[in-house]
Each structure stands twice: as structure tokens, then as C-alpha cells.
Swiss-Prot record:
Species for this entry: Drosophila melanogaster (Fruit fly)
Localisation per UniProt entry: Cell membrane
Protein name (Swiss-Prot/TrEMBL): Sodium/potassium-transporting ATPase subunit alpha
Enzyme class: translocase
Stated consequence of mutating residue 429 to C: In RNA edited version
Family: Belongs to the cation transport ATPase (P-type) (TC 3.A.3) family. Type IIC subfamily.
Length: 1041
């Protein structure tokens, strides 16, 4: 079994691989240099370019000898390039800078918002209004202003909605700007033997550069000289532990070898000299930037739904408008009347306030999510998260606490579990045994980590530490167990130290002890367990020193295997009291030419560390599973560690085996196991390199629980694309620059607010402010709820379309005076219906929405045929009946019985007729008739408001009874009051008869619509009763939207 220890592997293989991209041979000149970017064809096939970027890096600059390197780049280690050669290279390759992607001009984006979707229909309506008004103005002495006002209102609606949408869109996509912030400004270069400070963008291939502590690496360089040089690759890899760099070639993989340093990473220690091997877009960082900014993300699920809905409604509006325009013509109407009628049909069909309602609903949910640590950058992402069917989660910091913690100890021949919980509420162990005291003394003294200053009130686990992650874990563990570690170190003064190095794989220090009766020096050592064990001849067990025999070695091996198998990083500890006769007080210890014993020591025990899971994660993963969401771990960490964490958080559930587990259980080779028998899979990045997209699809299809370990960022991107090929809606979490391509490609990218790089935050749609996976689950719940509530909101809004359209149809087909005007329709769509529709966004979930599978984007539409059938064919019809009932009542009260109204329209609308007789023989002037008509418009409008009360209440729930759901939504209760008050204001406010042609109504005219409102309530309550009684039955298939 591959065991891991800090010391055994060094750091090179245990940090996450950075994103890199292949450079095929046809992309280079004969001497291995890159071809000029300037001479590339004007149009590069974008898909081929991106496919090239997705390949792993394939270069040999780190393998060749320094002499071959200088020859290839025509440079010299001491003199650098000549000025002429540098100028030639600069002209050939262009500047050492990232090329920004082509942007869509802002005015084009603005025009798309101003003329897309419903907007085009409303513009046509507005233009028709202005045309009709101008014709009326030229043919009539006193033209009516209705069409002018209507045209102005429609134009205003379109412009305001367009500006609103444009503002929302313009806030996103600034990925490239955040990459630019990472680019260093200046670099120290040697040219013709002279040191120069140049702008970083003037560097060229073959330049010899010098970097020191605090600098940013100005290009990808091959290191030729180094002194204690360390770099922080976290901007590329997300792993912040410093990596040592030097001139030696140590690894085939260019990202893991010590002799390469990469553009935009930080030098944190020492100095180095190197030769520039890649510039600008060809650097590792440049390629990530190219990949992240070049990926086409496509539409969000909710945007697709809204476009589908817009096409549906637009189709209905155009079909009805044109059909009845033609019918009006055939029936002999004047073409101008037919145009006015066409405007009415369009205005009545288009829910003008709906896009604003959707945006406001999403904004409200985004605010609610922000209070739960989910900051949404792109509003449409709110719903996307609810549709998510697969989450590809990073491990470090998202599933885990992002701090190495001591998990187990082995002393006195037993494994002791340490407390890894965030609040120290876990297991306790005996801290009084001699074995623990000896082990804790070594861990305290043989440790260079220290707490940073000025953290007095901060809990121990939250304190910042200067030092290596493993040593920081030991320091915090000892501080919790023993108290003030710094004080213990003062009392046991350090005399000499041999720091850890990758050759010896141990660290030794010698101390004076606090025991005044014992003048001897204490030697303490820690390091890779097997290296420590081979330097020991005795072992300390239960307070006694015993000979380290084969039995004890086997016990050690078993413990080491067990802890290593848990994916933990294991360290061994030993000590030795130096005899005072050989090493008297004041002895000069020489750490270069060692003059003290480092063999025949006393072995004391092991300590193992892991970055433990966050407390809330197992529960969150279980919630995802019950919600039908597949959680895949994608990490750059070691497979054993990844599998251990996956098991502890439930990504690999208990009892589910991988191919390797089955082979081990049956004691057969792995090749003999049928992969489909294994529900779980741990896939190594190296295997992924050789896997075709079909094989990847098979892994994703047949394994329900998957861990991808040791993956590079392109592989993360390829995994995301694989999931999307399977039809999944994919959420991806990440924090490093290297994660940005996958974050951008995913349906929803989730970046980390605390540990995340600026680039990952720009590429993402959502930011977790607390870096906690559990917050994603909250987001999923909110996303599902908003989809349900948007359906309710749209059902409510669309229902009033029927009572708005039917008056125009009756006007044409039955030849009656117009029952409802176009301006009045706008008062409903942009006035009384807006607040109630938005209030449905506050509605609570009907049942446990996290117990159902994710929404199928192909079949479960925001607006489906069942919703249209309910809104238009059932509830809308009852509402239209209410409106016509009120219309006929008022007409009859004023002398026009229903029979008299049919066929009267031409006479009614003629200004020349001032003696039209009603059913009782009274004569009506044109002005009196119009006053009565506008009073009917107002009454029809009020009747729609009254039946919309019932519609709002029934839209609260799609399955539950209203009595079960209750009226706890105070926003909705306010909406009921608001629409009533607004309707009354529009009817009774002085001056409205001139502005909106709305007249005061008798109080009794509010009542005829109430029985219809009750009918709607009773009808729908009965429908839902039968829905609950017969789940999946005919009624559900026909009416459950």
C-alpha cells in the first residue's frame, strides 16, 4: 500500500497539479520555440483552439541539459540575449502579456435587451399606436389621445425593462481583468551582460531573469541557479504550501519538477536565476486564462425557460392578433379600427410586467441566499442551483476544514484517536500516561512552528501560525493538550538544530531540560516513520524502555499501515538523553559535521494528521443524495486521502465498494473484476489521461459514487463536460486559478469566499462566503423553491390574460361596444398584478422539496401545456365570465339590455350619432355613451381585480389545501390589500377620467364578481383534493403544473 508522509514524498507530489495545456509539435518552430502569435491566421477555429488548450502540457525544457537549453534559445547564462536578438524575438512573438478575448460591444448588448423577446412585440404595438394616432390627428378635428398615451406607455415599459435587464447582465464577466491583476509589472533581466529592469511585457523567449523573495515570477522559467528558493503556487494550484525550487530535474511532469517556475506565482524565499521558456498566452497561466475566457457557457436553464415561454406567448399573440385582424377586415371594419384592435390583442396577450416580476423574484431569493452565506453574482444562477443534478466538489477547504489536524497517535502500542472537531467536542484521551508525555514533549520541542503575534482572544484552532502545515497541526494539538507551548520551549532551551531536508527526511533538535536535577541534554527527532524507526534500537512502552525486536517492529508496521490506509500523513517521533560525561554542560554541538548520536535512539510513537471534514458536510451530502443529486469529489490530493475523506463524509457510502475493494475481498487481481459490479470508483488523474470520452461517460454512467484524485484542471474541465454530455446540470466548486475553466464551463460555478482567488471568484456564478459545502445545499433548496414559486407567479399573471383578450374578441365577433380598454389592461399588468405576483416569491415550500429528484430540464418546463390549460382554459374562463357579467349588469342598469348590445358597435362608436336609443327608448349622445363605456371598462377592471384575489390564494399551492398551507405569507396578504387599494385609487381618484378614462363606480358594482371568485376558490380546492387522493392519476396528468 502506498503510504504517505510529509517527509517521504517531499512536497512535489502532494500538491494539486496546475492547469496546463499541450503544445503540439506543429505549434513550434524547428528549434522548439513557439511560432509567432502575430503570424497566426486571422481566424483560428475556436473549437480546435480550446481542444488544444484542454490537453496536458507536453514540453521537454525541464529535461534537457542547460547547454542544450542555451543553444535552443541562443542565449548565455551570464550575458543573456543580445539586444538585437531580444528585439527580433519580441517582434516575432509579441509582448509577454495576456491577450484579452474579443468582447461584444456594450451598445450591441444594450440593443439586444431593448429589442429581444417581448420587447419587439411591444415596440410593434407602440409604433401601431403612434401610426393610428397620427392618422386620426390628420383626419379628425378633435382626435382622441388614447393611442398617443398608449404608445408612450408601451415605449416606456420596453425601455425601462431593457435598461433593467442590461444592468443585470453588465455586472458579470470580468474574468480577464482579474487575470491582469496577477501579472507582474517589472522584471530584472540580463542582456549583453548588463542587469536591466524592464517592463515584464518586454520579456522574450531566452531572456535570463533574476527573481528574489517577494517578486512575482515574470514568465515561465527554467531555473539554472537557486539559493533556498521557494515559490507559492497557490495562484495556480489552490494549495498554499511553499514549494522548493532548484536547478535539478526531479519529475517527468513539468508541473511537479523542481527546475521550472511559473508566470504570476510568488517567490516567498531565497533567490533564483532562470531562462524564459514561455511568454504571455503560452505560459501555464496564459493558457488557463485563454481557456477560462474562451469557454462558451451557454444559456442558464432559467434563461432557456423564459425564452421558451416568450416564444410561446409571442406565437399566441401574433396568431390571435393577425387572425382577428383578418376577420375584422372580412366583417367590414375600417382598417384603422382593425389596427387598434390588433394593438389591443397584443397588449392583452403580453404580460408586460412578467420579466420585471421574474427578476425581482430572483433578486429577493438572491438576497435571502446572501444572508445564508451564498453570494449570487448572476441572478439566473439562483434557479440553476435548484436544477443541479451533479455537484463536482473540490476537497480541500470545501469538504474539509482546510487545516491539518492531528487525527491519531500511536504510543504504548495502541492507536489513540485525537479530537478533530471544529469546536473540540470530540473524543478525549488520557493525557497523563508516560507514553503521551514523552510523545508530546518531542512534538512540542522538535517543532519550528509558532503562533503569529496579536491573537490574544482568538481560539487556538483559529489562530494563524507561521510554519509548515504539519508542524502547525502539532503545535495546535500540543497547545490544547499541554497549555502554553512557547513557555515550555523557553523552559527547555534549544541548543542546536538540524532542519528537515528532503534527503535525510528527519529533523533533530537538542535542548536543555527544565529538570534541575538532570543536567543531561535531550535530543528529539521527528520525520518519516520508517526513517525514524531505522535509527532506533529501543522503544518506550508503558513507561518502560524495551528492545526494539521483530514483534515491536511488526506492531509499528501494522499501526503505520492502518493510519496510512486512512489517508493520513504519518510522522515518527524518537528521543535520547545524551550522557553527561560525553556531552557536558556547554558542549559545542556541530550540526554541519554532526558530533552527536543520531542512531540507537529511543522510539516513542507516531502521530498522523489529516485535513478533517467539516462538521456539517456529511449531513449536507446525505441531503444531496435524498434530493437525487450526485456528489463527485474532484481533487488534486492523493487517492488514499481522497477516498478516506469521501468515506467519512458519505460521498462513498458505507457498504459500497470500489473495484480495488472487491479485488481485495475476493483475493483476485483488479483486472478480473467487472467494473460494473462496483458502485464506487476512485479514478487517478494518470488513468484519466488515457481515457477516451466514451470511457469517461461509462465511468460516470455506471458508478453512482465517484472520486477523481490527482486531477489536473483540464481534467476537471473534461469531467464537467462529461457530466454535461450525460444531460446533467452541473455545479462545480473551486478556489484556485486552476479551477477557473471548470467553474466557467459548469452550469453554475461556485467559488470560495475566504480561500478563493480573485480569478476563481470572477469565473464563478456564486460565492460561498463561509467556504462551506453545506451552504451549497441551502442554495439548492432555495433554487428549487424559487422555480416552484415562479411557476405559481406565472400561473397567476397569465390567468388574467383571458379576461383581457376576450373583450376584444367579443368586440369584433359580437359587434358590441368595447368592454375593456387597452390602457385599463396596462393598469392590470403593470399595476394591480405586479405586487401580488412578486409576493408569491415569499411563499413557503409545500412539502420537503429536498426529497424529490432534480428537475428534468427537457420535460419539466417553467411554463408547460398543463399550466396554460389551467390559466387560460379553466380559471381564466371563469374570470372572463365575471367581467362580462359585470359589463352586462351595468349596461342593463343604464338601459341597454344584452340583446340590444349585439350589432350596435358601429352606431355606438360613430361621433355623428347623438340619438342612439336604448332598450327603453332613451336617446344617448356620443359623449354620454362613451362615459358609460368607460365606466364599464372600470367595472370590468375591478371585476378582474376581485377574481384575481381568489386566483392569488389558489396559486399559493399546487397540491396542498389552502387550509393546510395557511395564510402565513405576509407579503402575499399585503399584495391582496395593495391591489384592492390601487384599484380603488384608480377608480375614485379625481382626474382619472381624463388621464386613464377610469370613472368612479357605485359600491354595489364591486359585488357581482364575488360569486365568481368563490367559484374559482371552490373549483380549485376540489381539484387539489382529488389530486392528493389519486396521485399520478388522470387529473394530475392533465392539470398539475
Amino acid at each position: 500500500m502506498a503510504l504517505r508522509s510529509d517527509y517521504e514524498h517531499g512536497r512535489a507530489d502532494s500538491y494539486r497539479v496546475a492547469t496546463v495545456i499541450a503544445t503540439d509539435d506543429d505549434n513550434r518552430t524547428a528549434d522548439g520555440q513557439y511560432k509567432s502569435r502575430r503570424k497566426m491566421p486571422a481566424k483560428v477555429n475556436k473549437k480546435e483552439n480550446l481542444d488544444d488548450l484542454k490537453q496536458e502540457l507536453d514540453i521537454d525544457f525541464h529535461k534537457i541539459s542547460p547547454e542544450e537549453l542555451y543553444q535552443r534559445f541562443q542565449t548565455h547564462p551570464e550575458n543573456g540575449l543580445s539586444h538585437a536578438k531580444a528585439k527580433e524575438n519580441l517582434e516575432r512573438d509579441g509582448p509577454n502579456a495576456l491577450t484579452p478575448p474579443k468582447q461584444t460591444p456594450e451598445w450591441v448588448k444594450f440593443c439586444k435587451n431593448l429589442f429581444g423577446g417581448f420587447a419587439m412585440l411591444l415596440w410593434i404595438g407602440a409604433i401601431l399606436c403612434f401610426v393610428a394616432y397620427s392618422i386620426q390627428a390628420s383626419t379628425s378635428e378633435e382626435p382622441a389621445d388614447d393611442n398617443l398615451y398608449l404608445g408612450i406607455v408601451l415605449s416606456a415599459v420596453v425601455i425601462v425593462t431593457g435598461i433593467f435587464s442590461y444592468y443585470q447582465e453588465s455586472k458579470s464577466s470580468k474574468i480577464m481583468e482579474s487575470f491582469k491583476n496577477m501579472v507582474p509589472q517589472f522584471a530584472t533581466v540580463i542582456r549583453e551582460g548588463e542587469k536591466l529592469t524592464l517592463r515584464a511585457e518586454d520579456l522574450v523567449l531566452g531572456d535570463v531573469v533574476e527573481v528574489k523573495f517577494g517578486d512575482r515570477i515574470p514568465a515561465d522559467i527554467r531555473i539554472i541557479e537557486a539559493r533556498n528558493f521557494k515559490v507559492d503556487n497557490s495562484s495556480l494550484t489552490g494549495e498554499s504550501e511553499p514549494q522548493s525550487r532548484g536547478a535539478e530535474f526531479t519529475h517527468e511532469n513539468p508541473l511537479e519538477t523542481k527546475n521550472l517556475a511559473f508566470f504570476s506565482t510568488n517567490a516567498v524565499e531565497g533567490t533564483a536565476k532562470g531562462v524564459v521558456i514561455s511568454c504571455g498566452d503560452h505560459t501555464v497561466m496564459g493558457r488557463i486564462a485563454g481557456l477560462a475566457s474562451g469557454l462558451d457557457t451557454g444559456e442558464t436553464p432559467i434563461a432557456k425557460e423564459i425564452h421558451h415561454f416568450i416564444h410561446l406567448i409571442t406565437g399566441v399573440a401574433v396568431f390571435l392578433g393577425v387572425t382577428f385582424f383578418v376577420i375584422a377586415f372580412i366583417l367590414g371594419y375600417h382598417w384603422l379600427d382593425a389596427v387598434i384592435f390588433l394593438i389591443g390583442i397584443i397588449v392583452a396577450n403580453v404580460p408586460e410586467g412578467l420579466l420585471a416580476t421574474v427578476t425581482v423574484c430572483l433578486t429577493l431569493t438572491a438576497k435571502r441566499m446572501a444572508s445564508k452565506n451564498c453570494l449570487v453574482k448572476n441572478l439566473e444562477a439562483v434557479e440553476t442551483l435548484g436544477s443541479t443534478s451533479t455537484i463536482c466538489s473540490d476537497k480541500t477547504g470545501t469538504l474539509t476544514q482546510n487545516r491539518m489536524t492531528v487525527a491519531h497517535m500511536w504510543f504504548d502500542n495502541q492507536i489513540i484517536e485525537a479530537d478533530t472537531t471544529e469546536d473540540q467536542s470530540g473524543v478525549q484521551y488520557d493525557r497523563t500516561s508516560p507514553g503521551f508525555k514523552a510523545l508530546s514533549r518531542i512534538a512540542t520541542l522538535c517543532n519550528r512552528a509558532e503562533f503569529k503575534g496579536g491573537q490574544d482572544g482568538v481560539p487556538i484552532l483559529k489562530k494563524e501560525v507561521s510554519g509548515d502545515a504539519s508542524e502547525a497541526a502539532l503545535l495546535k494539538c500540543m497547545e490544547l493538550a499541554l497549555g502554553d507551548v512557547m513557555n515550555i520551549r523557553k523552559r527547555n532551551k534549544k541548543i542546536a538544530e538540524v532542519p528537515f531536508n528532503s534527503t535525510n527526511k528527519y529533523q533533530v533538535s537538542i535542548h536543555e531540560t527544565e529538570d534541575t536535577n538532570d543536567p543531561r541534554y535531550l535530543l528529539v527527532m521527528k520525520g518519516a516513520p520508517e526513517r525514524i524507526l531505522e535509527r532506533c534500537s529501543t522503544i518506550f512502552i508503558n513507561g518502560k524502555e524495551k528492545v526494539l525486536d521483530e514483534e515491536m517492529k511488526e506492531a509499528f508496521n501494522n499501526a503505520y499501515m492502518e493510519l496510512g490506509g486512512l489517508g493520513e500523513r504519518v510522522l515518527g517521533f524518537c528521543d535520547f538523553m545524551l550522557p553527561s560525561d560525553k556531552y557536558p554542560n556547554g558542549f559545542k554541538f556541530n550540526t554541519d559535521d554532526i558530533n552527536f548520536p543520531i542512531d540507537n535512539l529511543r522510539f516513542v510513537g507516531l502521530m498522523s494528521m489529516i485535513d478533517p471534514p467539516r462538521a456539517a458536510v456529511p449531513d449536507a451530502v446525505a441531503k444531496c443524495r435524498s434530493a437525487g443529486i450526485k456528489v463527485i469529489m474532484v481533487t488534486g490530493d492523493h487517492p488514499i486521502t481522497a477516498k478516506a475523506i469521501a468515506k467519512s463524509v458519505g460521498i462513498i457510502s458505507e457498504g459500497n465498494e470500489t473495484v480495488e475493494d472487491i479485488a481485495q475481498r475476493l483475493n483476485i487481481p483488479v483486472s478480473e473484476v467487472n467494473p460494473r459490479e462496483a458502485k464506487a470508483a476512485v479514478v487517478h488523474g494518470a488513468e484519466l489521461r488515457d481515457v477516451s470520452s466514451d470511457q469517461l461517460d461509462e465511468i460516470l454512467r455506471y458508478h453512482t459514487e465517484i472520486v477523481f484524485a490527482r486531477t489536473s484542471p483540464q481534467q476537471k474541465l473534461i469531467i464537467v463536460e462529461g457530466c454535461q454530455r450525460m444531460g446533467a446540470i452541473v455545479a462545480v466548486t473551486g478556489d484556485g486559478v486552476n479551477d477557473s475553466p471548470a467553474l466557467k464551463k459548469a452550469d453554475i460555478g461556485v467559488a470560495m469566499g475566504i480561500a478563493g482567488s480573485d480569478v476563481s471568484k470572477q469565473a464563478a456564478d456564486m460565492i460561498l462566503l463561509d467556504d462551506n459545502f453545506a451552504s451549497i445545499v441551502t442554495g439548492v433548496e432555495e433554487g428549487r423553491l424559487i422555480f416552484d414559486n415562479l411557476k405559481k407567479s406565472i400561473a397567476y399573471t397569465l390567468t388574467s390574460n383571458i379576461p383581457e383578450i376576450s373583450p376584444f374578441l367579443a368586440f369584433i365577433l359580437c359587434d358590441i361596444p368595447l368592454p375593456l380598454g387597452t390602457v385599463t389592461i396596462l393598469c392590470i399588468d403593470l399595476g394591480t398584478d405586479m405586487v401580488p405576483a412578486i409576493s408569491l416569491a415569499y411563499e413557503h415550500a409545500e412539502a420537503d422539496i429536498m426529497k424529490r429528484p432534480p428537475r428534468d430540464p427537457f420535460n419539466d418546463k417553467l411554463v408547460n401545456s398543463r399550466l396554460i390549460s389551467m390559466a387560460y382554459g379553466q380559471i381564466g374562463m371563469i374570470q372572463a365570465a365575471a367581467g362580462f357579467f359585470v359589463y352586462f349588469v351595468i349596461m342593463a342598469e343604464n338601459g341597454f339590455l344584452p340583446k340590444k348590445l349585439f350589432g350596435i358597435r358601429k352606431m355606438w362608436d360613430s361621433k355623428a350619432v347623438n340619438d342612439l336609443t336604448d332598450s327603453y327608448g332613451q336617446e344617448w349622445t356620443y359623449r354620454d355613451r362613451k362615459t358609460l363605456e368607460y365606466t364599464c371598462h372600470t367595472a370590468f377592471f375591478i371585476s378582474i381585480v376581485v377574481v384575481q384575489w381568489a386566483d392569488l390564494i389558489i396559486c399559493k399551492t399546487r397540491r396542498n389545501s389552502i387550509f393546510q398551507q395557511g395564510m402565513r405569507n405576509w407579503a402575499l396578504n399585503f399584495g391582496l390589500v395593495f391591489e384592492t387599494v390601487l384599484a380603488a385609487f384608480l377608480s375614485y381618484c379625481p382626474g382619472m377620467e381624463k388621464g386613464l378614462r377610469m370613472y368612479p363606480l357605485k359600491l354595489v358594482w364591486w359585488f357581482p364578481a364575488i360569486p365568481f371568485a368563490l367559484a374559482i376558490f371552490i373549483y380549485d380546492e376540489t381539484r387539489r383534493f382529488y389530486l392528493r387522493r389519486n396521485p399520478g392519476g388522470w387529473l394530475e396528468q392533465e392539470t398539475y403544473y
